[in-house]
UniProtKB/Swiss-Prot annotation:
Role of this protein: Provides the (R)-glutamate required for cell wall biosynthesis.
Reactions the enzyme catalyzes: L-glutamate = D-glutamate
Protein's recorded name: Glutamate racemase
The keyword Cell wall biogenesis/degradation appears for this protein: yes
Molecular-function annotations in GO: glutamate racemase activity
Catalytic residues identified in the record: 70, 177
Superkingdom assignment: Bacteria
A Pfam family reported for this protein in Swiss-Prot or TrEMBL: Asp_Glu_race
Family annotation (InterPro entries): Asp/Glu/hydantoin_racemase (IPR015942), Asp/Glu_race (IPR001920), Glu_race (IPR004391)
Assigned EC number: 5.1.1.3
GO aspect biological process, one term: regulation of cell shape
Organism annotation: Prochlorococcus marinus (strain NATL1A)
Pathway(s) it belongs to: Cell wall biogenesis; peptidoglycan biosynthesis
Binding locations of substrate: 7-8, 39-40, 71-72
């Protein structure tokens, strides 16, 4: 199958890695809208416009399923994407919310995601008595995209973001931005070992696997086969280097303009 997914930058790598682990032997098309990152401080209208452009581009990529690997877009413009695509769309927020077991849940997310209370609303839909507290983290994505991941600086920032959640004695912490699993080690320095970390990509990956298995039961079992194609809207060389580092692949990366109809495909 051909699976499409996108993010503003490298955050979606965390989703891609989880999906490849569970769903090898498929083709993946990854679009990084690097020209407009970070999404987490944009307005709802800006995010909806971006979602319209990205989903329109993917309509021409002959994909069988689409993964919203960006929580901010998921929170604000999931309906835009679903209305623009006539294929199954898998989202991070709904996938994570449906699997929550704990009664006190913290969420780290971008300011735009927190503003929508998308995680709170989704969790309460499945488990109405859950206590949920969301914390905006505007500094994380820029620091991660600049490879400032294992430094004391990001640990200090994480400490400030986590204190309000720890005061509420949370049992689990949702990483509500696909960039955040890249700083798990820094978060663990601050969090008590009793707090469970939840990566929404895990639940999404299982949902995708169930879908693929139900549609394709005779595919190759060679787990070494993965077909990857990458597209970016800017900073091609920088993105390529990051893909080599985080995914251990030497990808062909193409530059694409989402505002023009002369799309690369």
């Amino acid at each position: 199958m051909r699976i499409g997914l996108f993010d503003s930058g490298i955050g979606g790598f965390t989703v891609l890695k989880k999906v490849i682990e569970l769903c090898p032997n498929n083709s993946f098309i990854y679009l990084a809208d690097t020209a407009r990152l970070p999404y987490g401080v944009k307005t709802n209208n800006e995010i909806k416009k971006i979602a319209e452009e990205i989903s329109s581009w993917f309509r021409y990529q002959n994909i069988d399923a689409f993964l919203v690997a960006c929580n901010t877009t998921n929170a604000i413009a999931l309906d835009v994407i679903k209305n623009n695509l006539d294929i199954p769309v898998f989202d991070l927020i709904g996938s994570a919310a449906s699997n929550i077991q704990e009664s006190r849940v913290g969420v780290l997310a971008t300011p735009s995601t927190v503003r929508t209370k998308a995680y709170t609303n989704a969790i309460l839909e499945f488990k109405p008595k859950t206590f949920v507290i969301e914390q905006p983290c505007p500094a994380f994505v820029p620091m991660i995209e600049m490879d400032n991941i294992n430094s004391d600086d990001i640990t200090d920032v994480a400490t400030g973001y986590l204190q309000p959640l720890l005061k509420q004695k949370i049992h689990s912490l949702i990483l509500g931005c696909s960039h955040y699993p890249l700083i798990t080690s820094s978060l663990r320095k601050v969090l008590p070992s009793s707090v469970k970390l939840i990566d929404p990509a895990e639940a999404l990956s299982f949902k995708l696997k169930f879908f693929i298995d139900s549609k394709t039961r005779n595919y190759s079992k060679n787990k070494n086969f993965v077909d990857l194609k990458f597209y970016v809207t800017s900073n091609l060389k920088n993105f390529s280097n990051k893909a080599k580092h985080w995914l251990d692949v030497f990808p062909e990366v193409n530059l694409v303009s989402l505002q023009k109809k002369g799309w690369v495909s």
